[in-house]
């Protein structure tokens, strides 16, 4: 079979936008840490909503395992 029908595709990362160097490009770790910190919006309650949904969806599975374990002991 001839090899001319084979196509290779390569992906190369390309920098589309260059960042300007900041004033704190030296050894100032405090400025870097402060800049990376992102405040979580919404507070504590929106973080609990996915956990509550996961618990509600897991209840039938937990109950079935408990029922099977109790039936095996009899």
From Swiss-Prot:
Which of UniProt's keywords are assigned here? DNA-binding, Late protein, Virion
Task: Write down the InterPro entries for this protein, in alphabetical order.
Answer: Adenovirus_late_L2_mu_core
The site annotation (Cleavage) covers 27-28, 43-44
Provide any one GO MF term from the record: DNA binding
One GO cellular-component annotation of the UniProt record comes to: viral nucleocapsid
Location of this chain's protein in the cell: Virion
Q: Which residues form the propeptide?
A: 1-27, 44-74
Q: Does the keyword DNA-binding apply?
A: yes
Q: Name one Pfam family in it.
A: Adeno_PX
Query: Which protein family is it in?
Result: Belongs to the adenoviridae pX family.
Q: What does it do?
A: The role of the precursor might be to condense the viral prochromatin for encapsidation by virtue of the two basic domains.
What's the protein name? Late L2 mu core protein
Q: Give the species this sequence originates from.
A: Murine adenovirus A serotype 1
């Amino acid at each position: 079979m001839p090899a001319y029908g084979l196509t290779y595709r390569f992906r190369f990362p390309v920098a589309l936008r260059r960042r300007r160097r900041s004033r704190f490009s030296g050894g100032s770790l405090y400025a870097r840490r402060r800049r990376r910190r992102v405040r979580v919006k919404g507070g504590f309650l929106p973080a609990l909503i996915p956990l509550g949904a996961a618990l509600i969806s897991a209840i039938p599975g937990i109950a079935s395992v408990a029922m099977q374990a109790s039936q095996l002991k009899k």
